[in-house]
A protein has these predicted regions:
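N-terminal cationic and glycine-rich segments that engage phosphates or anionic surfaces
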Residues: 1-143, 186, 243-246
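Positively charged, low-complexity, intrinsically disordered RNA-binding extensions
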Residues: 141-247
Length: 247
């Protein structure tokens, strides 16, 4: 099975984020807080929290930092309440962009997101204006380089059958990574099966995958889009940005 793998984009994003660990830990800290408030502090009984913990570990967040975040969220009844908000819009040449944020001030976040779009010659649209161009899917990336670094030998067919038997929809054997796609509701089960088999995951999350990708050839469009994406990346309220640009 194969598809349009975005491992190169994920790798680029991860390398970029490695220089911004503080921002990444802030993002995950908010996700931990929301997961705990939604389903309690016990990962055994809270699949959303288990998924966030797995994401934290994939980003090398120390265990004590994870534990402190869970304890703080569980005991901080009067703490900050974060609300999940989604914005949709267009970048240069009609590039579709979805922004997901966790915020304690929707007015501030809306203003910052709108500013990021405007400065990159884009515009925020109405809810649903571009989301129909994406599919919500669980996506697990297993880096071949990381497997090699950990002296882990993998039989691609065995890994594919393990993933599919656990409920995955698709499996891709790409040059640099194995990519596993699931329905959102099956993501946790598939991830946990792979985790039990000690497969190191470069990325494991429910994401928005474009149905089609758009190539930009105009250098000014590329500069403008990167400006928008950089501004969104710098905003602490922004958790994830999805787009259909084929970088």
């Amino acid at each position: 099975m194969s598809g349009h793998s975005k491992f190169a984009n994920i790798k680029h994003k991860k390398e970029k984020n490695d220089a911004k660990k503080g921002k990444i830990f802030t993002i995950i800290g908010r996700e931990i807080a929301v997961a705990v408030k939604d389903g309690g502090p016990d990962p055994e009984n809270n699949s959303k929290l288990r998924d966030v913990i797995a994401k934290a570990k994939a980003n090398n967040m120390p265990n004590d930092t994870i534990d402190r975040g869970i304890k703080k969220a569980a005991g901080d009844g009067d703490g900050v309440n974060y609300e999940e908000v989604t914005y949709e819009g267009y970048g240069p040449s009609g590039i579709a962009i979805i922004v997901k944020a966790l915020t304690d001030n929707k007015n501030r976040t809306a203003s910052n997101v709108r500013n990021a779009f405007t400065k990159g010659s884009g515009s925020v649209g109405t809810q649903g204006c571009v989301s129909y161009m994406f599919d919500e899917k669980g996506q697990i990336i297993i880096s071949k380089e990381e497997l090699e670094d950990n002296d882990i030998e993998v039989d691609a067919d065995e890994l594919m059958m393990l993933a599919l038997d656990a409920g995955a929809e698709d499996f891709s054997d790409e040059e640099e990574a194995y990519e596993i796609i699931t329905a959102p509701e099956d993501f946790s089960a598939v991830r946990e099966v792979l985790e039990k088999e000690n497969y190191p995951m470069a990325s494991a999350e429910v994401t928005m995958i474009p149905q089609n990708y758009v190539t930009l050839t105009d250098e000014n469009d590329i500069r403008q889009l990167n400006r928008t994406l950089d501004l969104l990346d710098e905003d602490d309220d922004v958790q994830n940005v999805y787009h259909n640009w084929d970088e």
